[in-house]
Amino acid sequence: MPVITLPDGSKREFATPVSTLDVAADIGPGLAKACIAGRVNGELKDACDIIDTDSELSIITAKDEEGVEILRHSCAHLLGHAFKQLWPEAKMAIGPVIDNGFYYDIDLDHKLTQEDIDALEKRMVQLAKTNYIVEKRVGSWQVARDTFEARGETYKMEILDENISKDDQPALYHHEEYVDMCRGPHVPNMKFCQHFKLMSVAGAYWRGNSDNKMLQRVYGTAWADKKALKVHLNRLEEAAKRDHRKIGKQLDLYHMQEEAPGMVFWHNDGWSLFLELEKFIRQKLGQYTYQEVKGPLMMDRVLWERSGHWDKYSEAMFTTNSENREYAIKPMNCPGHVQIFNQGLKSYRDLPLRMAEFGCCHRNEPSGSLHGLMRVRGFTQDDAHVFCTEDQVQQEVSACIKMVYDTYETFGFKDIVVKLSTRPEKRIGDDDMWDRAEEALKQALTANDIAYEILPGEGAFYGPKIEFTLHDCLDRAWQCGTVQLDYALPGRLGATYVAEDNSRQTPVMIHRAILGSLERFLGILIEEYAGKFPTWLAPMQAVVMNITDKQSDYVDEVVNILKENGIRASKDLRNEKIGFKIREHTLRRVPYLLVVGDQEMENKEVAVRTRDGVDLGKIQISEFASKIKEQISLRSLNLLEE
């Protein structure tokens, strides 16, 4: 007679074994109707799974985040069901859940078109509307193998052969005539899978290995209700408008081409953005007392082997040979910084030593994963390493955290999620060392009044880590900043300092990044601002336009005054109507549009309007220059009078 304990502490006793669905029905018909699955003693289970011992149970519905994930997974099976009806010859591979949706990898000789995707979605809708029951059957490995062999599902057979023990009992989910294999759980009824949309199709190698066959990956999104689906689609529509690749082309910021995949060709305005961002970080480095250094672009393979990076990163490293020596272009800066630290004897009085670099790094990312500025092969890290004693860890981490928040606030990012990754099973050092390291990070976060989530076991083998994930205006998450303790690399590369007792000690190394990659962060900013950069960051901050040729000399005078005040300004003397000029520079997202006619010239004024169409009226040029200069120095996010 199992006794079921519910989240509110109430208990229900049953005479026979029960399922989550039975318990939900015992509570009430409404809950039974809404029940998707159950969390039994902390483990997700199908609604039909039997509970035969005293257990704690949480009933999962579509209102729960877990419930939405489950229905998304079931939508992947629904996709498979519909796909096999339309293309019976297709072979199904895998169909997992991803952020906001799902996908299915499929082997089909016919290349899917948009018309095919539309037909597939239509068939999915038809099937879902029948509200058919999903039947779970658990049997032997051989039964599962025979089932898929009879259906010619070679990928499912391979998964069974290579990934599932013959002693296991795989779960098969029957969607009418369609059968899929999964750990589950899944929805008990397709009535829960009504609000979805297929989004796109792309190529994907089986098991992510380019030596294997290229499959077709169909992506979809699914939500608990119509409203949530609509909100998500609207957000995607807005994201498409803000796509940094599209805006980058419109504003002539950069381009990429096939001869240099994953490498950025910065154009004048894009490089202006890059340099302004670098200038800002460089000022922060001075504020927080960092040295700025520059290490070589490539180093001998021997050094990468000593640092341990060769074992973990060699496949992602670009290499070259010269005079019988193999060199690797650096994928990160840390080994080079240790080499700089090692030059000359260091005392405990020299610590903490904070070393920063705008390091040009390269990683041989798979071509299919490259995505504009967000995923590149050549990138610049705002990388820094702090060499300190163990007693200094907390104060140094605290300073790093403050620097991260100072930086993000300048760009308007206030929604920041912080996670602390703790000791993994395989690690160096003893528990005392890890206790001290983790406690130092916790105390640094607490001292800065920062809430954080602990990720048990997710730290690196050489030390715990803090991750900073910022959320943009579309509520997308971008993991950018990290503060990572490292108790291994300094020792591997022979870094030491002379302690107060004259003994040789190994320093603790703190890896610190704020933006991560400047290229990626600029991609984030382009989308966050939709190309409307704050004045201090904008490539061109003001453009001065004449109405007739009579004002040409005055336009030159105004531009010179602005430039003398450190304002990036240009002139537009074209023989075009002023309305045409204003529209063109508005599309270029120039913050301030200055118009001069005879009256403005006579009074030494400019007529000012913003790129958003706000008319600021006529202003003395010296006054305007002073206001903009102040706005730039403060790195204000808003334009004048906004």
From Swiss-Prot:
The keyword Ligase belongs to this UniProt entry's keyword annotation: yes
SMART domains listed in its UniProt record: tRNA_SAD
UniProt-annotated stretches for the region Catalytic: 243-534
Record: residues binding Zn(2+): C334, H385, H511
Entry-linked InterPro entries: aa-tRNA-synt_IIb, aa-tRNA-synth_II, aa-tRNA-synth_II/BPL/LPL, Anticodon-bd, Anticodon-bd_dom_sf, Beta-grasp_dom_sf, TGS, TGS-like
Keyword Thylakoid: no
Entry's cofactor comment: Binds 1 zinc ion per subunit.
E.C. numbers: 6.1.1.3
Cell compartments where the protein resides: Cytoplasm
Cofactors named for this entry: Zn(2+)
Domain TGS, first and last residues per copy: 1-61
Molecular functions (GO terms): ATP binding; metal ion binding; threonine-tRNA ligase activity; tRNA binding
Pfam families named among the record's database cross-references: HGTP_anticodon, TGS, tRNA-synt_2b, tRNA_SAD
Alphabetic keyword roster: Aminoacyl-tRNA synthetase, ATP-binding, Cytoplasm, Ligase, Metal-binding, Nucleotide-binding, Protein biosynthesis, RNA-binding, tRNA-binding, Zinc
GO biological process, one term: threonyl-tRNA aminoacylation
Catalytic reactions on record: tRNA(Thr) + L-threonine + ATP = L-threonyl-tRNA(Thr) + AMP + diphosphate + H(+)
Record NCBIfam families: thrS (TIGR00418)
Biological function: Catalyzes the attachment of threonine to tRNA(Thr) in a two-step reaction: L-threonine is first activated by ATP to form Thr-AMP and then transferred to the acceptor end of tRNA(Thr). Also edits incorrectly charged L-seryl-tRNA(Thr).
Subunit structure: Homodimer.
PANTHER family the record matches: THREONINE--TRNA LIGASE, CHLOROPLASTIC_MITOCHONDRIAL 2, THREONINE-TRNA LIGASE
Family note: Belongs to the class-II aminoacyl-tRNA synthetase family.
Protein name (database record): Threonine--tRNA ligase
Organism of this sequence: Shewanella woodyi (strain ATCC 51908 / MS32)
Gene name per UniProt: thrS
